[in-house]
Amino acid sequence: MIAYLSGVVREVREGSAVVVAGGVGYEVQCPAGMLARLKPGEAAEFSTRFIVREDAQLLFGFPDADHLKLFDLLTSVSGVGPKLGLALLSAMPVSALAAGLIGGDVKLLSSVSGVGKKTAERLALELSSKVPEHLAAAASGAAGGKRPARVSSTAGHDAVDALLALGFREAQVRAAVAELLGADPEASADTLIRKALGRLR
């Protein structure tokens, strides 16, 4: 079992990163938000889940225990494998995902690629009472649908408007753009749109 990994990023790929630790390169599949922050040559730490199948051995990495806990909860639901669990964590911040689960927001959950209505309903039903208390508290404002994620910069507003025009849901769009701005407050609208599209599709 590999529960934690610390090393130097060698390469960032689509959906994963190669991390060198102890002279060995590990391919770590990560949420999109984490991948966007990884840079070759820099040190990185991951809370990990190692999954062994008949045809593959997969290592999933997360920035903290909260992401890992939510990943484990998601994949405990019938019909939700690790790839889909990762897709859900890539589509929005943990707090927004927790809000959707707590509030039974089937529309939000089913807006993620690969999540059908029945799966979204099952996620909401089975996990609404299992989300850790501190995540529930962080998401309590959003769970009522009254306070969308705050986007303060002009570039952020422009990015939100452009993404809404493409048909994405407002809660998802605002959450994605707000998280990107948190990582890079000076990001341009074009950069925000490009990176947000990678998460929302």
UniProtKB/Swiss-Prot annotation:
Region (Domain II): 64-142
Gene3D superfamilies given in the database record: 5' to 3' exonuclease, C-terminal subdomain (1.10.150.20), DNA helicase RuvA subunit, C-terminal domain (1.10.8.10), Nucleic acid-binding proteins (2.40.50.140)
Keyword DNA repair: yes
Keywords, comma-separated and alphabetical: Cytoplasm, DNA damage, DNA recombination, DNA repair, DNA-binding
Annotated region described as Flexible linker, given as residue ranges: 143-150
GO MF entries: ATP binding; four-way junction DNA binding; four-way junction helicase activity
Region (Domain I), start-end ranges: 1-63
One GO term (biological process): DNA repair
Highest taxon listed in the record's lineage: Bacteria
InterPro entries registered for this protein in UniProt: DNA_helicase_Holl-junc_RuvA_I (IPR013849), Hlx-hairpin-Hlx_DNA-bd_motif (IPR003583), NA-bd_OB-fold (IPR012340), RuvA (IPR000085), RuvA_2-like (IPR010994), RuvA_C (IPR011114), RuvA_C_sf (IPR036267)
Region (Domain III) location: 151-201
First-listed, main subcellular location of the protein, grouped into a coarse class: cytoplasm
Subcellular location: Cytoplasm
Function in brief: The RuvA-RuvB-RuvC complex processes Holliday junction (HJ) DNA during genetic recombination and DNA repair, while the RuvA-RuvB complex plays an important role in the rescue of blocked DNA replication forks via replication fork reversal (RFR). RuvA specifically binds to HJ cruciform DNA, conferring on it an open structure. The RuvB hexamer acts as an ATP-dependent pump, pulling dsDNA into and through the RuvAB complex. HJ branch migration allows RuvC to scan DNA until it finds its consensus sequence, where it cleaves and resolves the cruciform DNA.
Family recorded in the similarity comment: Belongs to the RuvA family.
Domain notes: Has three domains with a flexible linker between the domains II and III and assumes an 'L' shape. Domain III is highly mobile and contacts RuvB.
Oligomer and partners: Homotetramer. Forms an RuvA(8)-RuvB(12)-Holliday junction (HJ) complex. HJ DNA is sandwiched between 2 RuvA tetramers; dsDNA enters through RuvA and exits via RuvB. An RuvB hexamer assembles on each DNA strand where it exits the tetramer. Each RuvB hexamer is contacted by two RuvA subunits (via domain III) on 2 adjacent RuvB subunits; this complex drives branch migration. In the full resolvosome a probable DNA-RuvA(4)-RuvB(12)-RuvC(2) complex forms which resolves the HJ.
NCBIfam families referenced in this protein's UniProt entry, alphabetically: ruvA
HAMAP family in alphabetical order: DNA_HJ_migration_RuvA (MF_00031)
Name this polypeptide is given: Holliday junction branch migration complex subunit RuvA
Organism: Deinococcus radiodurans (strain ATCC 13939 / DSM 20539 / JCM 16871 / CCUG 27074 / LMG 4051 / NBRC 15346 / NCIMB 9279 / VKM B-1422 / R1)
Lineage: Bacteria, Thermotogati, Deinococcota, Deinococci, Deinococcales
GN (gene name): ruvA
